[in-house]
Amino acid sequence: MGFHRPKMAKLRLACTLLACAKGLTPQRMPAAPKTAQNVATVEALGEAVAVAAPDAFDWFDHWYPVNVVDSMDPSRPHKVQLLGLNLVLWNDGATVGGEKAAGSWRAFEDSCPHRRGPLSEGRVEDDGTLLCSYHGWRYDGSGACSDLPYSPESKRERHQRSASCASFPTQVADGMVWVFPNRAISAIEALLKPAPLVSELHDPRPGEDRDWQVKIPAGVRDFPCGWDTMVENTLDPAHFCAAHHGTLGDRYSDPRAYAFKTTKKVSRDGGFELDGDMGSLEFVPPCLVKYRPNYGAMPFEGALVLATYCVPTAPGKVRPLATVLRDRAAPFGETLAERALAVFMGPTWFPGLVPKWFGHIASSVVLHQDAALLYEQYRNLIDEGYEPTKPGSKSFNQVCYMPNDVDRGVTAYRRWLQVHAGGGVPWACDDALPPRGSEDIFDMWDAHTSHCSHCLDAYRNFGIARDVAAGAVVVAALLPDAAPRLPVGLAAAALALGIDRFMGLFRRYEFSHHDND
């Protein structure tokens, strides 16, 4: 895959010279993705046909949100994946007197130049450097080696110059850390490329006068399904009726012949837009979907925006980051869905009343209604022969039957993917998947809790409360008076068991459609 476009050559040269003048080091180009595509796919008579696409969508030439600042502990490194790249995020602010300075969020390749140990297992030191836990080498925010303790003093400076980390441009916008996954250009040049931000927050539609209340992503979640099936899911409002029965729809009364029409045609950089009976849909490349629901089963009819970044992390994995916008003037709590969303949005709309960790846990009720469906759907598509980045793949229309208007968003997205984007992400890693059924699709600990500062703190506090309650059982057994011993002991035991059961929601939450009456 090429990372340079001829028309940008002069601009990039100017930016590189400017970067050098400011003492910045241009980023090195990453290794070529193992599955890089140089063709796009179009559908002709139901068959996949490869055609030359010299200006196909460049997946590595765009900004992606990868984490939520509010849930990140700046005193430790955070492992993330993007397009098959293994990265580590960390904050280079110094700590003085126990107070961490604001600093900047940095993104390095999660691999120490010394012996390729994972930097995500390292430490952020008080001086704002990242220390590799394997041998103690340190790196500053630019990626330069700031300390190489094993080198003789006479050679240390020369050794350090040859030991820089591979770094990627970053920025913070709309409460999220964004990464530009192309080391071939400088950070300054990357910032010249606009990030696909939610336009309602920065450039409202003409004539629209909305006072948006905003909930930045409720929490980071990783799902073991294809990122493209997650995009497809967010472009499919009809699934709310059945898949989210009891929360966002009714499988028996809501399905009907909903109509949709295209309001903005599919294009490489512009994506597409649709409008219909269930609201409006917009796809913004590379991975943003915006849905404005406008039918009775969904909350805040016509006054809500669900903006979801379906971040492609690795083959068979996706990190959805959803920003929710609600018009402040919209009435509150008239339907079950609105009351449920009030809990989800509580830390923003009712500050101080609902802790942030509760919104994270509560959101799994809706998210896990999709989990098994998307995991199995992604594997079924592969089993049916749909692998659009590989030669000989069937077309989407060959493996799926979509005769109705309500699937128009999915059809438009698959057309964009095939015609303009080489069929999908050219992963920077091997695209082999783990055996089917080997992943825990209802996991909460590794998918969220372990790297969310709010939920991790809450889990630890609940653990302390549980242990105190368990200790009270022992104390009750030692009471000299037998009369209060039994009720006190039983109450303490019930409390300890109840807390432990609730803590299970931080570890795993399983959902069954069979049992969802």
PLM feature segments, named:
Residues 1-27:
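N-terminal chloroplast transit peptides
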Residues 7, 101-104, 161-164, 348-358:
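Glycine-rich, flexible loop segments associated with nucleotide phosphate handling
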Residues 7-10, 22, 34, 38, ...:
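Intrinsically disordered, low-complexity polyampholyte segments enriched for Lys and acidic residues
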Residues 37-47, 51, 57, 67-206, ...:
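Rieske [2Fe-2S] iron-sulfur-binding domain
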Residues 55-60, 344-345:
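Short, positively charged
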Residues 62, 85, 166, 304-306:
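Short beta-strand or tight-loop elements
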Residues 96, 185-517:
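C-terminal catalytic domain of Rieske-type non-heme iron oxygenases
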